Structure formats: C-alpha cells, structure tokens
From Swiss-Prot:
It comes from the Archaea. One of its GO terms (molecular function) is structural constituent of ribosome. Binds to the 23S rRNA. The lineage of its organism: Archaea, Methanobacteriati, Methanobacteriota, Stenosarchaea group, Halobacteria. One of its GO terms (biological process) is DNA repair. InterPro entries: DNA_repair_Rad51/TF_NusA_a-hlx (IPR010995), Hlx-hairpin-Hlx_DNA-bd_motif (IPR003583), Ribosomal_eL32 (IPR001515), Ribosomal_eL32_arc (IPR023654), Ribosomal_eL32_CS (IPR018263), Ribosomal_eL32_sf (IPR036351). Residues 1-47, 68-182 are annotated as: Disordered. SMART domains: HhH1, Ribosomal_L32e. This is Large ribosomal subunit protein eL32. Keywords: Ribonucleoprotein, Ribosomal protein, RNA-binding, rRNA-binding. Part of the 50S ribosomal subunit. Interacts weakly with protein L15. The keyword Ribosomal protein applies. CDD domains: Ribosomal_L32_L32e (cd00513). It comes from Haloarcula marismortui (strain ATCC 43049 / DSM 3752 / JCM 8966 / VKM B-1809).
Amino acid sequence: MADNEEDVEAEEEYTELTDISGVGPSKAESLREAGFESVEDVRGADQSALADVSGIGNALAARIKADVGGLEVESETEAEVEEEGGEEAPDEDVETELQARGLTEKTPDLSDEDARLLTQRHRVGKPQFNRQDHHKKKRVSTSWRKPRGQLSKQRRGIKGKGDTVEAGFRSPTAVRGKHPSGFEEVRVHNVDDLEGVDGDTEAVRIASKVGARKRERIEEEAEDAGIRVLNPTYVEVEVSE
C-alpha cells in the first residue's frame, strides 16, 4: 500500500512540463514545439531526442530523464553497465588529429589590384614600434610612446635607435584592416548577427565571451550559409588511413 501511495504521489507531482527540474516556461515551450506535449511524452523519449531540442542540450536532457524517469531508469542503466563490464575489449591505438569546424579553406573573391596590395602589405610589413629604452629598464614596457626628450636619438631619427610611428608605414587604403586572407572581418555574438553577411567578401569572428553551445550553433549556421569563421573550434577526429 505504501509503495502504491508513493507512485501515485510521484505521478501527481508532475502534471505540467514546468514541474520538471530545470524546465522553465521558455524550455517548456521549446519542448512543446518539438512535439513533447506532456510529462508522459518526455518520460517516454530518449535522452538524445531531448538533447536535440533547442535550448535543452545533453546535460539538461540527462537531468530531465533522471528527474522524470525515476529510479527504474537508473537501475536498468547500472545493470547494463555491469553486464557489459564482464567482457574487456582490447585496447586499440587510434590515431587522431585536431580539425577545425567549418569552411577553413574558403578564400574571398578579390580583384587583381586587391590581391596585389595584400601581397605588398605582407611583403613590406611593419616595424614593431617599441617604446624607447624598453630593453634597458624592466619597468618600461614595449607599448609605444612617442619619444619627447630633447636629446632622444629615436626622436631625431638616428639609424638603429628604432622607428617612430609615421603615416608612411600605413597599409594601402584598399586592404587596410582586412584579414590576411583578404576577408573583411565581421564580429558576431549570436546567430542573428550572421544575417546580412556576404560570404564571398566577408568572414565572421566569434566574440570571446560566447559560450560553447552558442558557438557551435553559430558555426553550423555559418557553414550552411557558406560563411567562413576565422576563429573556429577544433575537434578531435580519427585519422582515416
């Protein structure tokens, strides 16, 4: 009798999707849009199917299954693990390598003049513009400061004392600020920022504050739209012989 009462209480406890641990109104709406209308639908679904729902992910899907599925799911999982553990598979050395996601080899459509100017910019280069006496005093950093002393040899332009910042060192105007590949960089923080990006002349750089889950969605959308990501995520994959 006590066990039956506990089962009834457990069933009555979850009447709405929002009663499940970790599921708020927004995530409940995402579950409904994916076809999970009730708690019973969630209880009968696989963890992988829940993880594919927008805004859920694998970690929250496991939490939902643990909360809704009860102890029966956990005991079955443990039993399966114990049965599989009896046979020890031989260790195989699998060669892996890191590969970048997305269109890493894509190049922009450049005119002959822009291609020439990019080559010129790379060939000529720029001085480092280090601060005067940075190599003499530890407290002096390398960040550029204009020399102002009357006896400063760097200010007077004496050879070997370091270059000073002047307009003549700037890059050609047509390719100024472009990525070495020739793309114009566009900074993105979410999927919506990809709208309006021209994949033939522009490439995106994902902001450093973007999390792993949102970064993955941005990279997938960029690849589908034919847009190159300049700072892609590297994943470990097996090397095919």
